[in-house]
Amino acid sequence: MSDTFAADFLLATYETERLKTLSVWSCFQEADLAFRPAPLARSPREQMVHQCVSEDTWMRNMFGVETGRPALPPAEDRLSFLRHYAECSRARQDALAAKGGAWWCEETAFFDVRRSRAWVFVRRLVHSAHHRGQLTVLLRLLGRPAYSTYGPTADTGGLFANHAPTIYRYESEERLLEAEEHGGDWPELPGPGEKPPTERP
């Protein structure tokens, strides 16, 4: 695998992961942001705070990528989080796109060890995916619709083995931000139908 191919792959993955994060965030209602499912668990608002602060810290300290913006939005409501994360992560995407393929293979500090930037970036992606998964559970507990992140959900049709479709809430960051100003787009979800939506019902 060439350095350029690896860089293009990482950047393309980051772009889709950014949209997935924004899409999950968009499914929460304003009143949901304070929901705490257990005393030691983060609320949705705290997960959004963590995502913004953590990604800002990793990008500045491990990749030297500055956005020129504060880590957090001026107000901690859902629309402000959506706009701010979209803006900051887009700026990071553009800055990373200007780096050459060899840059990704160079080592950087990863807490108390040194790893290649590509290695660290993969950890950043899965770190974000981990917390996004936690938020998806909160959506289910709150009774909110569960659109696809990577594949079918019980709401989009059940199990992949039963030929359930993948239904994303948004196809682009631009449409998401535009629609969320006016209540959002809510594509119809068919539900699981007659077959069980889980493997061991």
List each language-model region with its residue ranges:
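Solvent-exposed, charged/polar functional surfaces in cytosolic regulatory/catalytic domains
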Residues: K20-S23, C27, A91-A95, Q134
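Residues within well-ordered alpha-helical secondary structure of globular protein domains
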Residues: C27, H50-V53, E87
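Helix-adjacent hinge/juxtasegments
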Residues: R60-G101
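Short, contiguous alpha-helical
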Residues: L11-L22, D32-P73, F110-P201
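Surface-exposed helix-capping loop/turn segments at secondary-structure junctions
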Residues: C27-A34, D94-C105, L141-Y147
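Residue-level recognition of alpha-helical structural elements
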Residues: D3-A6, L40, P74, R78-F81, ...
